[in-house]
Amino acid sequence: MTMQTVWQTYQSMTRDRSVTNKKVARSTVRRIFRYARPYRVIIAIFLITLVGTSLLSVAQPLLFRRIVDDGISVGNASLVTWTAVAIAGLAIGDAALGLVSRWYSSRIGEGLIFDLRTQVYDHVQRQSIAFFTRTQTGALISRLNSDVIGAQQAFTSTLGGVLGNLISVTVVLIAMFALSWQITLASLILVPLFLLPARYMGRRLQALTREQMTLNAEMSSQMTERFNVSGAMLVKLFGRPDAEAGLFSGRASRVRDIGVRIAMANRWFFTALTLVAALATAITYGLGGNLVIDGAITLGTLLALVALLAQLYGPLTALSNVRVDVMTALVSFERVFEVLDLPPLVRDPDDPRQVPEGGLSVAFQDVDFTYPTGAQVGLASLEGVAREESVHAGEPVLHDVTFESAPGALTALVGPSGAGKSTIIALLARMYDPTSGSVRIGGIDLRDLTTADVRAEVGVVTQDAHLFHESIAENLRYARPEATDTDLIEACRAAQIWDFIESLPDGLDTVVGDRGYRLSGGEKQRIALARLFLKAPRVVVLDEATAHLDSESERRVQLALDTALQGRTSVVIAHRLSTIRRADQILVVDDGRIVQRGTHEELLAAGGMYETLYRTQFADS
């Protein structure tokens, strides 16, 4: 038995049998075939190469028989020479076919990975924000990597392995029965003895491998959470480096110990298979040798049978696990399809309308909103923990919200924490659709526009501005990829951040670090504003955008807002008195309702909640 055969048998026997009893819907199989359709020609060629490889593998032992019986035994040197040349030619042909087979299987597998990964990535990006608030990032990345690769194996390792082994076993058995049915039957009697150690060690290796994967996942999770700026800062602030090192060391030592056990189990596995194969070969030599002595078969036939026997046990054992192999691949497909079948909460209309030209008004009309439940927006298998609904899921958080902001007007939202201000902003950016009522820009319901058009017209700066671990220029061009350096500089000047960028050694090419942590809060905010100005939306949303700025930074941002927001409709969650005083209307939000509205002076004169908020939050300003 060759090492390649032993390794293929090992891979098959160590598949996770937890999937054996799973039932996969027929629709899943049909769907897989649809993914395979673009590769049907390549798959056909791949199968032809498998058949060719099997035939060439069987042909070589038959030529051994000829070279012994018809060449060496009778002293025919010419036949020996030409048969040896033929054997060499078959070996070269077998190797060439193996390369061709591998090339085509790689084309199939890598093409499938590309198709699935790009489709899953695009689909996930279209999910609502609620999906990401519930989903464990590591589990989602696993779907994009591990499960997609597992699905790919259905067309490479599993498809090639199952069909290749089936073809090999069939061709080898036909050849062996044709040479000697007695020796062939004796060899098959040993098959159960061959399967027993493989199955036992396979189960043992499965358990150890699952334990190792769990331990590695725990270590990976610890590193992911600690090896970012926020996690590292928390560890340092609480003086926990030694404790963290001890925790990691404990997990690493368990991985070390399990690795040693797996190595020994592997050794026992290969030893058992090799011993059983050697026993089968010994029996074949013993029985076949006596048949040669009796004249029932020739010496060449015996040698050919031994060579064929070496090709039989590995594929035969692997085929005994065909259900595990196939189900493992199908379950991987099913897990990928589970993500693809999750419908986005916000969808584009079949017949979208166009955004009108000119200034855009913003209007909320009788809007009620309830945050979706986990079953509506997420997958329990991606959440990492037992599903628990958030405080607001399934409960109304906005009630009969109605207001209108004229083109170019500034509307300020004020109110206590949890009143519903951020929810109003999320609806305006169409992160969600209202449960009832409508949200309109330019008189058109957002649900009648494509999400691309909404995002092009509505620009948002959140309280915690997110920057990618890239250069300042790349972060700015996220808003407009085709922007020139001149465009970037103008946007930065409008955001009062160019002087700072110009003072940096690398200027616009300065890398901002993970989430922009190399910059101060005020610098991040102003770069985010520059990105907004570069986008040049007609509706601007500032979600507590100046909450982290010092007085000088706020002054500079206010100067930028005064000029950059002219002619644009603005909705601001206000935390600064200067913003409130500039507002054309102020909406006081409490418990999901607009309880007061008017200008700063009007609301102060009217008393009520606004006056209370003003006295407690803004009076010192």
Task: Pin down the residues of each PLM region.
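Transmembrane helices of ABC transporter permease
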Residues: 38, 42-55, 157-211, 284-297
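Helix-loop-helix
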Residues: 72-82, 175-189, 261-334, 339-340
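Membrane-integrated ABC transporters
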Residues: 1-57, 72-86, 101-105, 122, ...
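Short intracellular "coupling" helices and adjacent cytoplasmic loop segments at the cytosolic face
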Residues: 12-20, 110, 118-142, 146-148, ...
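Juxtamembrane helix-loop junctions of ABC transporter transmembrane domains
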Residues: 17-25, 48-49, 56-69, 90-137, ...
